[in-house]
Amino acid sequence: MHEAFTIEQLPPSWQEQLKDEWSQPYWSQLLAFLKSEYAQATIYPKKENVFAALQSTPFDQVRVVILGQDPYHGEGQAHGLSFSVPRGQALPPSLRNIFQELHTDLGIRNESGCLQAWADQGVLLLNTVLTVRAGEAFSHAGRGWERFTDAIVTKLIQNRTHVIFVLWGNAARQKCNLLFQTKHQHAVLACPHPSPLAAHRGFFGCCHFSKINYLLKKQGKTMINWKIE
């Protein structure tokens, strides 16, 4: 089980940034918890997909961070990228709203909910907590993942410049407010969460997709192609 969560699973650029986390006491406690959980319950995503966000978007290639909460807890949904589902899966409500805003903003219609194409272009689709029990939202909160993902965000803030942090909802905003206390050279886009409960409070109409591309263009970088083929 421990072999499933080794630093060797990460791209070299993330290994260099996160190597100290593997020796922290919280990490061995988290591993022990995960070993027990995967042995006795159905846990999402599959072990090999837990680090999919980091594997898909190496540290030196991150241009945008879209921060989620914890993985989808329905069967076959979570595959390691925040808000994303594998091809062929029905769109969860939050993702449906994300695609609705994308269409309003840029006229793009996406059918597949697999956001791998975004990750491949430098969009880090990172959840705050990387695992969950089937059918039990937030069941792995407070077990150590938050500290690990704090380290990820902190390394990006400290060791990269001009990353665009996209914070949808209070949880993402609160997490990053704590970490953004030092002066930094990054852009932050924030609005309510795309869930049906909050989307009408300001997520719809946020135009974050066009704003991200405006900022990238201003930096002289290639814009994100949000269309999923």
UniProtKB/Swiss-Prot annotation:
Domain of life: Bacteria
Keyword DNA repair annotated: yes
UniProt subcellular location: Cytoplasm
GO molecular-function terms, A-Z: uracil DNA N-glycosylase activity
Cellular-component GO terms for this entry: cytoplasm
Active-site residues, record numbering mapped to chain: D70
Major place of residence: cytoplasm
PROSITE patterns, alphabetized: U_DNA_GLYCOSYLASE
Keywords in alphabetical order: Cytoplasm, DNA damage, DNA repair, Hydrolase
Function: Excises uracil residues from the DNA which can arise as a result of misincorporation of dUMP residues by DNA polymerase or due to deamination of cytosine.
Protein name: Uracil-DNA glycosylase
